[in-house]
Amino acid sequence: MKRGFTLVEVLVAMAILVVVLAVGVRYFASTSELARNTQARSELQDRVRMVMQVVTADLQMAGARYWNSGNQNQAFSLPLPPLSGSNMGPKDTLTLYYVTSLRDLASACRRVDYGFEGDTLRRSDVNATPSSGSDCTTPPPNSQPLAEGMLALDIQYQCSDGSRKDTPDCGTDAYPRSAKVTVAGYSLTSVTNPGPASLTTVTGKTLACPQGRACYALTQEVLMPNLKPLPTP
């Protein structure tokens, strides 16, 4: 003879169902949180790497004077100094000039600037090519946001006389041969277990990570061969 479920059996089944649902909700919430944290950290690392790639490429080009395309060649004179900057703690500024063959002759001379507005790193890249002659001009910068959530663009310059400087000015008897660059930033959203509370830059500056944000830093050395003075005849 068939019989229905007793009240006790129904209550037990409901209790089991509630436990299973609670475990499922907790699992999916944990998975979603893990995905958000992973995405935030990945975006942070990609952003810092992008800034490092752009900055080191510009530094490597600083002082380049020649434009070449096929059989066409053009030498330009750059404003002096072709690389200048200020030591602003961990947020340095830069102004540099170079000639690139990746653009046509009418826009080969470039003026590039870096500076901060709060925690936003801004970059300017403007055409400094003269309408006639071979002397690159000094146009005003036109800064655009490059990356948000940046703690540092800290640069230490290795001079040809062996000294280390926090600005590109190595004096009259030396030139900046290379630069060690620290780029640091923080995640744009909060994460669980954010990691270290502070970071240290190449010049020894301590960076405090914002509460609840992951921080990430890269330090890289870049050679600047175009800044070596041309031999005098």
Swiss-Prot record:
Q: Where N-methylphenylalanine occurs, residue numbers?
A: 5
PROSITE patterns linked to this entry: PROKAR_NTER_METHYL
Annotated region Disordered: the residues are 121-143
Alphabetical UniProt keywords: Cell inner membrane, Cell membrane, Cell outer membrane, Membrane, Methylation, Periplasm, Transmembrane, Transmembrane helix
Membrane-crossing segments per the record: 5-25
GO CC terms in record:
cell outer membrane; periplasmic space; plasma membrane
SUPFAM superfamilies hit by this protein: Pili subunits
Reported consequences of knocking out the gene? Mutants have a wild-type piliation phenotype but are deficient in transformation.
Matching Pfam families: N_methyl
Pro-peptide residues, renumbered to this chain, are 1-4
Biased composition regions of type Polar residues, renumbered to the chain: 126-137
Q: Which InterPro entries does the entry mention?
A: N_methyl_site (IPR012902), Pilin-like (IPR045584)
Q: Where in the cell is it found?
A: Cell inner membrane; Cell outer membrane; Periplasm
Q: How does it sit in the membrane?
A: Single-pass membrane protein
Q: Outline what the protein does.
A: Plays an essential role in natural DNA transformation but is not required for pilus biogenesis.
What name does UniProt use for this protein?
A: Pilin-like protein PilA3
Instruction: State the species of origin.
Output: Thermus thermophilus (strain ATCC BAA-163 / DSM 7039 / HB27)
Q: Which gene encodes it?
A: pilA3
